[in-house]
Each structure stands twice: as structure tokens, then as C-alpha cells.
Amino acid sequence: MKQVEQQDREFLFHGNVEDVDAFLKRHPEVFSDDVRTDFLQAAREEELSSVRANLFSWVYGVTVDWREEDSEIVRLFGEFLPGEVIVEETDEGLTLSYAGEIYSIPLTFSPNDRYITIRGIADIIQKQFEIRLFRDSYWSDTHVFVLMSHVQWQALERSHTAEVEKIFQKITPELDFP
């Protein structure tokens, strides 16, 4: 289970070029030396808040293409959940096994299914976790999400209310690929 570390949550909102370098070094499995060099250059030339958000999304984001297979979406979010998530495709949609329970996510077998799946996962985990969209990814054909516990989201909202609202969008019934 991947979890968003406290120092990385704070990095999202505060930090200079040296902090960008430290973040990159904490995540060598994500950032090759060439990519690290590119991000350091960007941190020197571009708005730091945008660079920090981009880095954070590379490490903790769940990236969903508008053509993504729905079972793969479940698998990707499952990496951020405790325990095993098992998904099976059925004639009606998806069947998930999570935390000892079985859940169904009915699908329409249309492009709308990406967000039907995401909302279905969000409903299943809503007692402990929340999924939010990186706003900067909305107008793309690939959306990036972050899954964190309610405790983590609440702590961020208490300390960085305006910034959280600016960076993330809550998942709503209307939200879909543009």
C-alpha cells in the first residue's frame, strides 16, 4: 500500500529548489537522473508551486486515461489501499472484493464508465478514504487523482484551505472527462 508521507504533503505547499531536489532524491524509483535534472531546471525557471504539484502527482497520483480499462483503474487505486483489492469483469460491469466485502459497480460499456468506476471506488472506500482530482489535469484526456485518508485530507484542509481547493477537486456525480 502506497501512502502519502507527511513531509511530501507539506512539500506540495511549501518548498524551494533545494526541497525539490530532496523530494526527487526521496523517490529514486520514480525519477531517473535525467528526469531529476529536468525537474530541477524547471524548479529554477518556472513557478515552484506548479513544479511541486507536478512532482507530487508523479509519485502519488493515480493516472487514468479516458480509454483506460475499468479493471485497471481499480488496480491502480488499489495500490493506495490497505489489503488486497480483487476485481473481476462481469457482463454487468465489475465485481470488487475489498476488506472482506463484495461490491458491484454496474457499467454502461461506454466512455462514461471511467468516472462510473472512479465514483464506484470512491463510494466503496468513503468511510476511510477520499479520492480527489488534480484540477490541472481536468482538460486533458488523462486525469490524475490522489487517494488519501479522510484524516490526511482534513489535516491539509485545516492548514492549507485555499491551496487544497485550488489544486484538488472533489469527485462529484457530474464530474467526467470533458
Which sequence ranges carry the predicted segments?
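Contiguous interface-forming segments/domains that mediate binding rather than catalysis
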Residues: 1-178
